[in-house]
Structure formats: C-alpha cells, structure tokens
C-alpha cells in the first residue's frame, strides 16, 4: 500500500506504468491525479502538498534517466 510519504516507490510505479510520459513536463495537478490512480495507492488524496509532489516528480525524473 502506497502512501504520500513513499515518494521513491510512487515514482518507480509511475515510471513503470507511464514510460511514455516525460515527468519534467507534468504539472502538480496532473501528477497528483496520476498518483491517486495508481493501483497500490491507499492514502487520503487531500494529504498531498507541493513538497511531496515535487519529491515524487524529482524521483520520477531520476528513474527515467
């Protein structure tokens, strides 16, 4: 079960599920929705914030490199 604090695991899941997406161009609203739609995500959608989303995005960019 993924929670917002699992930023690296979320990034890996996003990379595996959406290899066609370049994460550096994903805005935070879309990123939030992509995370919420992950099969293993089970946290409160309202608990996300800019710091968490930025961490997910940076980890996703690193995974893609």
Region spans (language model):
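A charge-rich, low-complexity, intrinsically flexible signal that marks solvent-exposed coils, linkers
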Residues: 1-65
């Amino acid at each position: 079960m993924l929670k917002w604090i699992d930023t690296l695991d979320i990034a890996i899941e996003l990379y595996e599920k959406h290899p066609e997406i370049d994460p550096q161009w994903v805005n935070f609203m879309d990123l939030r929705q992509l995370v919420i739609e992950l099969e293993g995500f089970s946290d409160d959608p309202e608990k996300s914030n800019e710091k968490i989303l930025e961490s997910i995005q940076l980890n996703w960019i690193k995974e893609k490199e």
